[in-house]
Amino acid sequence: KSNTLIKDVKIKKRLFNKIYIYVDEYEVLFYNQNTSKYVLENKKEVLLDGIVVPTLINYVPDTKYNTFINKYILLDDKVKQKISEIKYDPNTIDEDRFFLYMNDGNYVYITLTKMELLNKYNEAITKVEGKKGTLYLDSGNYFEIR
C-alpha cells in the first residue's frame, strides 16, 4: 500500500492454497503542465512516465480546480479518452468556463455547472455527421462548424 497509485489491496485465500490479490488503483485524471505531475482522483499529484491522459495546459484557481476535479471524475471514461487538452478559459460572463481540445479535431466550451453534459458528447458529435467545429455547452447547447 505504499505506492501512491494504490487505493486498496485485498488478499483472499481460496481452496487448494491459492491466493488471490486484488488491487484497486486511483484513476489518473490528467497531466498538469504547470506542475509537471499527473493528478489522481484523490487530488494528489505524482510523477509518472508514459501515461496517456489529457493535459491541463494552464493555471486554474484552487477553488475552480477542486470543483473541476470533482466534476471530471464523474465523466464517462469514453469521453475522458477523447479529451486531448484542457484549458481554463474564463470570460467576463463565466468564471467557470473551460475549453477542451478533443482528439477527434473538435473543440468544446464547457462550464463547471454543466460538466455532466460532456457525457452526451458522442451523441452530439454523431448528429453533425463528421463535420469539425466547436460545441458550446457553456452558455448554450449548439455546434458551430469551422
Regions inferred by a protein language model and the residue ranges of each:
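Extracytoplasmic/luminal low-complexity segments enriched in Pro/Gly and acidic/polar residues
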Residues: 111-146
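Short secondary-structure junctions
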Residues: 2-7, 74-83, 128-131
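Hydrophobic residues embedded in beta-strands of well-ordered beta-sheets
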Residues: 17-19, 38, 45, 96-98, ...
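A mature extracytoplasmic/lumenal domain signature
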Residues: 13-15, 23-27, 52, 90-92, ...
